[in-house]
Curated annotation (Swiss-Prot):
GO terms for biological process: nitrate assimilation. Heme b binds at residues 138, 228. Probable multiprotein complex; a catalytic heterodimer of an alpha and beta chain is proposed to associate with additional subunits involved in membrane attachment and electron transfer. GO terms for cellular component: periplasmic space; plasma membrane. It is a peripheral membrane protein. This is Putative respiratory nitrate reductase heme subunit ORF7. Its cofactor is heme b. Signal peptide: none annotated. CDD domains: DOMON_EBDH. Binds 1 heme b (iron(II)-protoporphyrin IX) group per subunit. The respiratory membrane-bound nitrate reductase enzyme complex plays a role in generation of metabolic energy by using nitrate as a terminal electron acceptor during anaerobic conditions. May transfer electrons to the iron-sulfur centers of the catalytic beta subunit. The keyword Aminoacyl-tRNA synthetase does not apply. Keywords: Cell membrane, Electron transport, Heme, Iron, Membrane, Metal-binding, Nitrate assimilation, Plasmid, Transport.
Length: 276
């Protein structure tokens, strides 16, 4: 074999190696990729007690790290909030939806014993009409939202809102909350029946993706009312198929194309040198 042929054979072998590495890396990513801003809903068994924050049922449920930012507000120091990331998991049985929230908080603020003291709190927001996305700041009169609002003093409220300052409490909350605080971290599970025929109460039984947003208050940092950490819209994939771009696949595809591009440039350089 000539020296020129040896160089070409080496270049081809390099490309083959690159493609094998690419397929090994991209294959699993393409299989596990999910649409952007999706909170996967995993099926679990009711007997595994998913309502408990420390249940082993949650070990097999994918978690999403949701970035949090200060909510726009005219309150003093409204931009000075402390919760930057919320870990979210979601599961369902045949009858109920479970949403598990977990975040770092150095103090468990459960009681108010004096002025200027506030309890920790968290909220889950979903639209009443699951086919249309409402304004993220508490919905609107035409497209209201349900808010599941938990306070560390033990209270869970189910609210209806049609815009900022319009919240009204359901006469009886259908939302149940279980909580755990350990090693500087809150973990709570909020759950509700999937189906609901009640007026102005979200039903998860339809074949529609359901938008969802989150909020967290750190009581020891004077966070209350509009001073809170909030997310952008995410969604539960209850619909018939993927919605939105599979961002993980896109990232891996870009990386793969870059590898192939480098390999092609290498081949051209080898061929050029071989012809000199």
């Amino acid at each position: 074999m000539s020296k020129k042929s040896e160089k070409r054979a080496t270049a081809v072998a390099a490309v083959v190696v690159c493609l094998v590495v690419l397929l090994t890396a991209v294959g699993p990513a393409m299989v596990t990729a999910r649409p952007a801003n999706e909170i996967p809903v995993e099926s679990v068994l009711a007997e595994d007690q998913p309502q408990q924050p420390t249940s082993e049922a949650w070990n097999s449920v994918p978690a999403v790290e949701v970035p949090m930012a200060s909510a726009p507000s005219g309150l003093p120091n409204a931009s000075d909030t402390s919760i930057e990331t919320l870990r979210v998991q979601s599961a369902r049985t045949e009858e109920r939806l479970y949403v598990r929230l977990s975040w770092a908080d150095g103090t468990a603020d459960r009681n108010i014993s004096g002025p200027q003291q506030f309890v920790d709190a968290a909220a889950v927001q979903v639209p009443v009409n699951t086919t249309a996305r409402p304004p993220i700041s508490m919905g609107s009169t035409r497209n209201p939202v349900n808010v599941w609002y938990w306070r560390a003093d033990g209270e869970t409220e189910e609210l209806l809102a049609g815009g900022p300052g319009t919240t009204t409490k359901f006469e009886q909350s259908a939302v149940e909350t279980k909580t755990a605080y350990d090693d500087g971290r809150w973990t709570i599970v909020m759950s509700r029946e999937l189906n609901s025929d009640a007026e102005n109460r979200t039903s998860f039984a339809a074949n529609d993706d359901v938008d969802v947003a989150f909020a967290v208050w750190n009581g020891s940092q004077m966070e209350r009312s509009g001073r809170k950490s909030v997310s952008e819209w995410y969604h539960f994939p209850f619909g018939p198929g993927p919605q939105g771009p599979p961002y993980e696949s896109i990232l891996w595809t870009v990386a793969g194309l870059a590898i192939v591009g480098v390999a092609l440039v290498t081949i051209q350089a080898v061929q050029k040198n071989g012809g000199d």
